[in-house]
């Protein structure tokens, strides 16, 4: 696993082998970042189910100003810390997604890009989308990137702007409804 573009291009990232988790494949990441490239510069990013931090690190490599990494697994938090040594704008916290969203709500931070890549079998995206909207965590022109396999995403708050399939995985990108 590596950073595929930007300032840290070619940087090897420490991976992981933990049941129920899997990193985003390089070809999916490359396509995704080609799609969202215009949203990245000087953005504030949330990588909510961060895993190794690969998506947030890619955003930082391509010009994001800050990234907040949350994961509930201490092993993964330690991997994120190792993978981000020497990088600026890093905020890493061990927390499940519910507590993470509550913390962010209280801090009044709004994000330009939010990555949601939870363990597929848990079907957490709909709950996350509801909370992101209700807690007002997304800037008006921000986007939410969802990666999943089988979850049926149903949101009244966000508009689908891009939908791609990569093998058995889907990437959907949403923005706020106007």
Describe the residue ranges of each PLM region.
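Class I S-adenosyl-L-methionine-dependent methyltransferase catalytic core
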Residues: 1-178
């Amino acid at each position: 696993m590596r950073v595929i573009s930007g300032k840290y291009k070619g940087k090897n990232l420490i991976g992981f082998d933990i049941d129920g988790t899997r990193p985003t494949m390089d070809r999916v990441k490359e396509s995704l970042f080609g799609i969202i490239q215009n949203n990245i510069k000087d953005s504030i990013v949330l990588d909510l189910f961060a895993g190794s931090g690969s998506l947030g690190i890619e955003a930082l490599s391509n010009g994001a100003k800050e990234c907040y990494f949350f994961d509930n697994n201490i092993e993964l938090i330690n991997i994120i810390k190792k993978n981000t040594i020497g990088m600026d704008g890093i905020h890493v916290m061990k927390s499940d997604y519910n507590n993470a969203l509550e913390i962010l709500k209280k801090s009044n931070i709004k994000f330009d890009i939010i990555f949601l890549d939870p363990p597929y079998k848990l079907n957490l995206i709909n709950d996350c989308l509801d909370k992101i909207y209700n807690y007002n965590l997304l800037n008006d022109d921000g986007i939410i990137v969802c990666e999943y396999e089988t979850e049926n995403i149903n949101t009244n708050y966000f508009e689908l702007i891009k939908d791609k399939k990569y093998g058995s995985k889907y990437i959907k990108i949403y923005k706020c409804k106007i």
